[in-house]
Amino acid sequence: MKYLWLFLIYAIGLFATDKTLDIIKTIQKLPKIEVRYSIDNDANYALKLHEVLANDLKTSQHFDVSQNKEQGAINYAELKDKKVHLVALVSVAVENGNKISRLKLYDVDTGTLKKTFDYPIVSLDLYPFAAHNMAIVVNDYLKAPSIAWMKRLIVFSKYIGPGITNIALADYTMRYQKEIIKNNRLNIFPKWANAEQTEFYYTQYGEKTPMILKYNIQKATHENIASSQGMAVVSSVSSDGSKILMSLAPDGQPDVYLYDTHKKTKTKITRYPGIDVSGVFLEDDKSMAFVSDRSGYPNIYMKKLGLKESAEQLLYEGRSNESIDAYKDSIVYVSRENLNEFGKTVFNLNLIALNSKYIRRLTVNGSNQMPRFSMDGRNIMYIKKTSQEYAMGLILLDYNQSFLFPLKNVKIQAFDW
């Protein structure tokens, strides 16, 4: 590679005690890529691919992106004058009577076609995933930090009417959405059961008690996991999927339980005569953080995975800290704050690390709820609501950048990715 740029993603902060990911930016510019599309075979579909691919590359923070239509043969001399380094051409090809999405990646500096990537068009509405995979191919060609998270599915529960929520799947931009569980019941709190995203847990309210079910997407089959009076929710899944943390209330007061997916057994691991909920695995699944009212208000605590292990308070700032997620030794949580200048309560996201007292604020206004780490812990998705917008939010921690994807005609109860 003869390009004159460097991706210095790992910074001093990566090794500092607060684990905050800072970025060292070089004086070099980002590689410039021109994203083009062909009007042959299916111009509308190619245009959709083109738009999503360009936005993905912009979102990655790894490229300077421009957009254009196909202009015949690649004029490398003209592109060099424009200081363009790469050209990504998306098109729809027809082979053996079947349409496929195609990406061709040209290296302007060497004047050659470097990559051809085909993605079958199984269903027209799946075009966002074709574009996401294309973005990953382009990104990997430069050996930039991974953006594989872009192709992951979002599973979410959406409100339909009184007492009715359906479970649906989506891509991270929410362009693609498909309902997969529709039964005129309350289906809530979906949580992925494995890294492959072939199964997920969710809570269904039946005629008597809430039940935790495990659903296999490929087989469309259910497995009963647990039930409990009042509350039954899966809040965290271990990295290998062998254990889950559940909030159950068999005796009226909710506690956190550890469930072994192989032995099909559950063990109570909190016993405070109040509220202990929302356990999330920490420290390579050896401990957990959870929300409790032991302080007289919702706050975050930590303990090892045993009933007799003591609980340690993690936060001493704020009077209402809740809705948490964790990745290794990092915790993101929602903090309720004082009324803003418009007289409304603000719910902001904050990030902390176990070995640091530093609190990193991630949002500044509105109601920001349900933070969820990506699989690599470098990004966070959440729901943002203000008087002007309702959207799925994305925070790139390495770059201190955030994006909002409007949620139109859908109200989300809970989600996971």
UniProtKB/Swiss-Prot annotation:
State a single Pfam family of this protein: PD40
Q: Check the record and name the InterPro entries matching this protein.
A: 6-blade_b-propeller_TolB-like, PD40, Tol-Pal_TolB
User: What is this protein identified as?
Assistant: Tol-Pal system protein TolB
Q: Which domain of life is it from?
A: Bacteria
- SUPFAM superfamilies, per the entry: TolB, N-terminal domain, Tricorn protease N-terminal domain
For this UniProt entry, which residues form the secretion signal?
1-16
- Quote the subunit structure annotation: The Tol-Pal system is composed of five core proteins: the inner membrane proteins TolA, TolQ and TolR, the periplasmic protein TolB and the outer membrane protein Pal. They form a network linking the inner and outer membranes and the peptidoglycan layer.
Keyword Cell division carried by entry = yes
Task: Tell me yes or no: is Cell division among this UniProt entry's keywords.
Answer: yes
Q: Matching PANTHER family, A to Z?
A: PROTEIN TOLB, PROTEIN TOLB HOMOLOG
Give compartment(s). Periplasm
Q: Name one GO cellular component term.
A: periplasmic space
Role this protein plays = Part of the Tol-Pal system, which plays a role in outer membrane invagination during cell division and is important for maintaining outer membrane integrity.
One GO BP annotation of this record = cell division
| HAMAP family the UniProt entry points to | TolB
Q: Keywords in alphabetical order, please.
A: Cell cycle, Cell division, Periplasm, Signal
The record's comment on protein family reads: Belongs to the TolB family.
